[in-house]
């Protein structure tokens, strides 16, 4: 994803499902574990009732059980009555008969540690809720098989009772996908994204923010749901993508300001985070739920539900995310040991709370390390047998302290040969970096908390600069290796623009147009760039052409409106903004730009309406608050005008105009005149 201005939370904050308060379910490790030190074989008989049932019930039955009759059942379109287990487990393990029938298979997968699914190596890091059998447990299972799988005396043990309903109590907010997605029987694996509007209860405050302590994910069809992630979309760009896609949801997670905040996988217990580490959810934001679904041979409907547990108390410790990643992945067909690396030097002392590695089907091994300033090295994570089906975020039992100057590094290896049984392409083909499951990725997200509160900004600024440089280098590589691809040059130009390299950006956009003269995106970007460089007429020419080529794109209409205004044609500018608002009512920039032109023309009521709409979508637009304050002041709504002036100043403490507006409203000067400046900085797409 392209994420420019801020240090971000981890994808899925995947580990936000793990926290200081641990609710133990059958798929969790439980409160206490034995070490993996060798254990002698028991001299007495090993029986199911006494020895094996406790292991299976604690470590396996959480997934190897039917969906509860009182839970929302999986909806089988084919009408079959087969037992459907949680997470698509192939059989249940709740009785002696179950265990005896599958005893040989159980012995094999536990001995190889393929089950329970847990990827990190035991010697590197202790994590919350580890799903790992001890050596003694594995030995007991093997001995039970050798002894002929005896049941034992006495009554059969009772299986665990799993919580019904919401495990964390009644949520403050319950959200369900607006429509079901039907997974066809012939679909191998599907990633699909769904917009979920968040109707936060209003507190009456200017910044109507809630703080999320937990998300509890209820899979209505865990048989086919492999995993899910939840992201916050503050700009509502997901709604645009959803409207453009004819089916339920849309295919690719959007780029930009979308921030992943939660991840779910089968068997993961929901956990209520402490109030001081909750994450902010602004009014007006949407959630985007990404579902990874795997067909089980029949058409099935999927429509999960989310429960949000909210707080009104701002957190005292806000986790940030350091992302190590290689976007230069280009694996030749047949290559069995392709390696990528990345590293970052910490500019401040941090505590590492969790680590989340991510790759697709070709990855084999992963390693994350920290080299401290004194020269010592600590392994943060080591995975020797990667399996994308069981990806997760791993939360340390005790946060790992890393001092300023520590170099954190990642190293991933990939196998794109016939020998990799997980390779989805037969015969193997070259594979590059990309978001699709048939592409490859290589990233590690470290969730960290700055030891000193003031260092959070230091981390954010430093990491943004570093990531922009890395993204630019990746875009340069793609443009060189795929020089006939206009989109690659356009993407590189955007990176150059973000870094202030305007000459280079203009060259790349001209290259893109040389390859694709009718590329609307490139014309729009070039027009915006030329306008910013003072070449107004040339800029408008490119923007007009972009609008003709792509007449229903609200982003291009906003840029053309800005171009019209820059050359003094306010009537045409207003017309373009109105078109953009009609095309996409959730385009905050269109509402804002329209308002700042309508106000000085005396259309204060309409300007106020558009400013309110812009702030409903993006409540942290300081210029929108300032302009709304002016409009409300002109209408005599002084109290609300003061509130918005203060909001503008809190968002932009250096704003002289916001300070002057507040002073005027507080009576130190006369109220602003109608032409005082109901025009803020226009916003481009």
Residue ranges and their predicted role:
Residues 475-477, 509, 543, 577, ...:
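Hydrophobic/aromatic packing residues within the alpha-helices of TPR/SEL1-like helical repeat arrays
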């Amino acid at each position: 994803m392209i994420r420019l201005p801020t240090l971000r939370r981890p994808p899925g904050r995947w580990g936000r499902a793990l926290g200081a308060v641990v609710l133990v379910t059958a798929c969790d490790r439980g409160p206490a574990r034995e070490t993996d030190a060798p254990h002698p074989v028991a001299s007495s008989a090993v029986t199911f009732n006494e020895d094996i049932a406790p292991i299976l019930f604690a470590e396996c039955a959480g997934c190897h059980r039917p969906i509860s009759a009182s839970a929302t059942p999986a909806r089988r379109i084919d009408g079959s009555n087969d037992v459907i287990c949680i997470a698509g487990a192939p059989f249940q393990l709740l009785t002696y008969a179950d265990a005896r029938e599958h005893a040989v298979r159980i012995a094999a997968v536990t001995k190889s540690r393929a089950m329970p699914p847990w990827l990190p190596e035991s010697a590197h890091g202790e994590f919350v809720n580890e799903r790992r059998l001890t050596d003694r447990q594995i030995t007991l299972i093997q001995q039970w098989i050798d002894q002929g799988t005896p049941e034992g005396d006495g009554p059969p043990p009772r299986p665990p009772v799993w919580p019904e309903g919401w495990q964390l109590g009644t949520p403050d907010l319950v959200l369900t996908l607006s429509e079901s997605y039907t997974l066809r029987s012939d679909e191998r694996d599907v990633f699909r994204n769904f917009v979920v509007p968040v109707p936060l209860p209003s507190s009456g405050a200017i910044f109507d923010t809630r703080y999320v302590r937990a998300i509890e994910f209820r899979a209505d069809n865990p048989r086919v749901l492999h995993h899910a992630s939840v992201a916050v979309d503050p700009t509502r760009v997901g709604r645009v993508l959803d409207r453009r896609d004819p089916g339920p949801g849309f295919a690719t997670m959007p780029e930009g300001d979308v921030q992943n905040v939660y991840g779910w996988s089968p068997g993961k217990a929901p956990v209520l985070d402490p109030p001081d580490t909750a994450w902010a959810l602004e009014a007006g934001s949407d959630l985007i739920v990404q579902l990874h679904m795997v067909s089980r041979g029949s058409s099935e409907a999927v429509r999960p539900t989310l429960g949000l547990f909210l707080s009104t108390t701002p957190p005292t410790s806000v986790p940030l995310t350091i992302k190590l990643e290689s976007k230069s992945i280009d694996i030749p067909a047949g290559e069995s040991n392709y390696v990528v690396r990345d590293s970052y030097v910490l500019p401040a002392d941090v505590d590492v709370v969790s680590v989340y590695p991510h790759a697709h089907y070709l990855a084999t091994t992963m390693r994350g390390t920290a080299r401290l300033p004194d020269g010592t090295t600590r392994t943060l994570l080591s995975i020797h047998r990667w399996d994308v089906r069981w990806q997760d975020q791993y939360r340390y039992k005790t946060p790992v302290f890393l001092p300023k100057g520590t170099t954190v590094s990642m190293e991933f290896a990939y196998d794109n040969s016939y020998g990799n049984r997980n390779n989805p392409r037969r015969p193997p083909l070259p594979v590059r970096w990309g978001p699709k499951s048939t592409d490859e990725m290589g990233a590690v997200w470290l969730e960290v908390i700055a030891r000193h509160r003031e260092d959070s900004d230091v981390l954010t600024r430093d990491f943004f600069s570093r990531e922009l440089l890395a993204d630019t280098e990746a875009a340069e590589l793609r443009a060189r290796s795929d020089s006939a691809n206009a989109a690659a040059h356009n993407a590189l130009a955007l990176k150059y623009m973000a870094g202030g390299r305007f000459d280079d950006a203009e060259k790349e956009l001209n290259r893109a147009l040389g390859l694709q003269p009718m590329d609307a995106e490139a014309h729009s970007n070039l027009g915006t760039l030329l306008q910013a460089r003072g070449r107004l007429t040339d800029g408008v020419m490119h923007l007009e052409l972009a609008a003709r080529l792509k007449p229903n794109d609200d982003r291009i209409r906003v840029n053309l409106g800005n171009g019209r205004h820059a050359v003094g044609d306010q009537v045409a500018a207003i017309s373009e903004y109105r078109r953009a608002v009609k095309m996409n009512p959730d385009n905050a920039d269109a509402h804002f730009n329209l308002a700042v032109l309508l106000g000085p023309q005396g259309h204060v009521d309409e300007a106020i309406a558009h400013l309110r709409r812009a702030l409903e979508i993006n409540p942290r637009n300081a210029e929108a608050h300032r302009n709304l304050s002016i409009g409300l002041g002109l209408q005599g709504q002084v109290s609300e005008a003061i509130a918005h002036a203060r909001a503008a100043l809190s968002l932009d403490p250096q704003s002289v105009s916001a300070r002057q507006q507040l002073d005027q409203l507080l009576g130190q000067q006369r109220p602003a005149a109608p032409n005082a400046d109901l025009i803020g900085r226009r916003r481009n797409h």
